[in-house]
């Protein structure tokens, strides 16, 4: 039952599963985490929304008019859309899977609050890249454990062009 319904604390669930010989099933193409993916994917979203809200609110009102929130994947975007409402965030966008089809939100944007995108990748598109914070959650899937939140200003190319270049369908 604890494997289906989250009855145990995360540490105890991992210990319980190892004790009875259950290894999380591999549902993605990357390494396994401590917990099954259906539990691991639930960790850190509220904290990520709070960090993103701090970054968003650090922008001046004038900057917010020219800004969007872009995430590295649809899970982060969905989490920010859901948890960000109560924090006053605009809907997040992503170039990942079907979120890509909804577009960048404001094609004229010149500032991006980037979530889960490495500052090095942002430097390819923006002149000024300012790291704000990073969320680390040991119970998340290994590829989701580090979520940098960064502000990019001064696009080197039009956002519409960067949007098309960054499309990720998997």
Protein language model regions, located:
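Short active-site oxyanion
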Residues: 64-69, 110-112
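Extended hydrophobic/aromatic segments used for targeting, binding, or gating
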Residues: 81-126
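An alpha-helix initiation/capping motif
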Residues: 70-74
């Amino acid at each position: 039952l604890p494997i289906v319904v989250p009855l145990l604390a995360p540490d105890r669930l991992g210990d319980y599963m190892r004790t009875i010989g259950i290894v999380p099933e591999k549902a993605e193409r990357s390494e396994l985490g401590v917990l099954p993916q259906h539990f691991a994917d639930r960790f850190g979203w509220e904290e990520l929304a709070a960090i993103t809200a701090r970054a968003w609110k650090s922008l001046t009102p004038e900057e917010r008019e020219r800004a969007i929130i872009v995430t590295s994947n649809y899970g982060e975007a969905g989490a920010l859309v859901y948890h960000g409402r109560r924090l006053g965030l605009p809907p997040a966008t992503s170039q990942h899977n079907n979120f890509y089809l909804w577009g960048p939100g404001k094609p004229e944007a010149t500032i991006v609050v980037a979530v889960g995108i490495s500052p090095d990748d942002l430097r390819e598109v923006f002149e000024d890249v300012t790291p704000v914070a990073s969320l680390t959650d040991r119970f998340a899937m290994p590829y989701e454990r580090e979520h940098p939140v960064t502000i990019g200003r001064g696009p080197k190319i039009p956002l519409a062009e960067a949007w098309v270049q960054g499309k990720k369908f998997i």
